[in-house]
């Protein structure tokens, strides 16, 4: 008998993967977690039936949410990651030799624990001595820390369940205070094909708070619509003014200096979503 995982991406759209083996299923205090081994995309992490990451294409998301802001900042030493308990963003952050401290604020310890056990290629950096894992509410952590981080990465799930509070103006204002005077925030801001209204709303929030607000894109096959957006808010540095010739080559599969520049060239319909008043 064939076993398939199916994600209901919205009321009219489903995405399915054929499953080799169910590795773990756990009902945590916050959500329903499963890690499955699939034929096409390797091991995958799902939360509440929504695909979070896969071994085959995770590098696109993690490289783009990390390297674009960290190479925009002139000298990132301290980085806060809100969410991201699978460890992929931590792995990418630690490719930057200037980084001295990474705080991972993850609300659900089961995500960290199971990722370490079943997703070693993604979670491999979580035991690095520069990493502090804070199991708890990332919003509360942000509110309690002022002028502390060079870069804040909001590596959240979709805007449902535990992540709802990470898509609010109050949270982005708190991040502004959490950042140093030349700090940068980047957040994953969903698919323009599915969440156009939300993206426009978030863009307006960022523009009200951060003097420099830019959107960029990447293609992630297993995410709804495949085309994915990220929104960056910066107090000082413009990501489009980075001299790409000065960006050092690091070990990546998707991100390059050329991709850094190209990612900010938005299709017209995406630009319209971000620019609509």
Curated annotation (Swiss-Prot):
Q: Write out the pathway annotation from the protein's UniProt entry.
A: Amine and polyamine biosynthesis; spermidine biosynthesis; spermidine from putrescine: step 1/1
- Binding residues for spermidine, per the UniProt record? 62, 86, 155-158
Presence of the UniProt keyword Protein biosynthesis in the record: no
Q: Where in the cell is it found?
A: Cytoplasm
Q: Which domain of life is it from?
A: Bacteria
**Start and end of every PABS domain?**
2-235
Q: Which residues form a coiled coil?
A: none
Give the UniProt family note: Belongs to the spermidine/spermine synthase family.
Where along the chain is the active site annotated?
Answer: 155
Q: What is this protein called?
A: Polyamine aminopropyltransferase
Where on this chain does S-methyl-5'-thioadenosine bind? 31, 106, 137-138, 162
Function per UniProt: Catalyzes the irreversible transfer of a propylamine group from the amino donor S-adenosylmethioninamine (decarboxy-AdoMet) to putrescine (1,4-diaminobutane) to yield spermidine.
User: Which organism was this protein described from?
Assistant: Thermoanaerobacter pseudethanolicus (strain ATCC 33223 / 39E) (Clostridium thermohydrosulfuricum)
**Enzyme Commission number(s) from the entry:** 2.5.1.16
GO BP terms in the entry: spermidine biosynthetic process
Annotated TM spans: none
Q: Its catalytic activity?
A: S-adenosyl 3-(methylsulfanyl)propylamine + putrescine = S-methyl-5'-thioadenosine + spermidine + H(+)
Q: Self-association or partners: how does it assemble?
A: Homodimer or homotetramer.
Q: Which SUPFAM superfamilies match?
A: S-adenosyl-L-methionine-dependent methyltransferases
Q: What keywords tag this UniProt record?
A: Cytoplasm, Polyamine biosynthesis, Spermidine biosynthesis, Transferase
